């Protein structure tokens, strides 16, 4: 049995001087989490470290930031009127990694960006920090990805929850791009933990990068924003940039 205490006070991670000209949504990614420099830092990285003719895929929420701040072409953004195009991007994220790679290369996509919100818990597992997801990033928006892609929800979500199934985490591009692995399922009321999902439990995760740069993967992680590795903040969001492996 494991008991987790949810912290009540959360430090922030931000340089206010560098962000004064930007809207609040870009500082917290549209979540209720504390503002940070993660999006601004990532957009600057994209602008300075990717070819000017690069095409970047992300969910439409962030497309406008990528096109205006990072000055890179995106597949969809807030102004996209084509339902078909938005559906195709949702299908990319919900496809198997191999199927998604075929779609990405067909669309000449060079980079894929995902955004994840998490909360670090007190305690650890063999030295690894523990996390709860579902904070308002793509890990929470995935149910909309699924609906727009018109896939069978029961295959991807545990019953009556927004928690991903093993199939989602292991067989979809989005699941593999979110750098967390479900360790156990915890029932706060009974203080019991389980290896498989049970009604009333919450997934507890550890950080785990699936697409690093030392394997033959469809993507490779080329940039993580600062909050992902900052152990001094509890509630945070982070941005991840993956490069499409064209070989």
Model-predicted regions and their roles:
Residues 2-247:
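Extracytoplasmic
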């Amino acid at each position: 049995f494991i008991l987790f205490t949810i912290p009540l006070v959360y430090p922030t991670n931000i340089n206010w001087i560098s962000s004064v000209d930007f809207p609040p949504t870009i500082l917290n990614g549209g979540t209720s989490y504390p503002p940070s420099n993660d999006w601004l830092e990532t957009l600057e990285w994209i602008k300075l470290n990717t070819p000017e003719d690069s095409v970047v895929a992300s969910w439409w929420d962030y497309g406008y930031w990528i096109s205006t701040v990072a000055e890179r072409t995106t597949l969809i953004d807030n102004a996209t009127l084509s339902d078909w195009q938005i559906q195709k991007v949702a299908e990319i994220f919900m496809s198997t990694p191999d199927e998604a790679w075929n779609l990405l290369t067909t669309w000449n996509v060079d980079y894929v960006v995902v955004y994840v919100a998490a909360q670090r818990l007190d305690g650890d597992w063999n030295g690894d920090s523990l996390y709860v997801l579902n904070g308002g990033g793509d890990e929470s928006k995935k149910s909309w990805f699924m609906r727009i892609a018109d896939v069978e929800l029961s295959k991807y979500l545990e019953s009556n929850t927004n928690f991903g199934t093993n199939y989602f985490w292991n067989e979809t591009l989005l699941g593999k791009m979110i750098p967390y692995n479900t360790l156990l399922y915890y029932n706060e009321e009974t203080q019991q933990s389980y290896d498989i999902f049970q009604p009333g439990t919450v997934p507890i995760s550890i950080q785990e990068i699936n697409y690093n740069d030392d394997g033959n993967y469809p993507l490779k992680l080329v940039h993580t924003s600062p909050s992902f590795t900052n152990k001094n903040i509890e509630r945070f969001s982070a941005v991840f940039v993956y490069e499409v492996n064209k070989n």
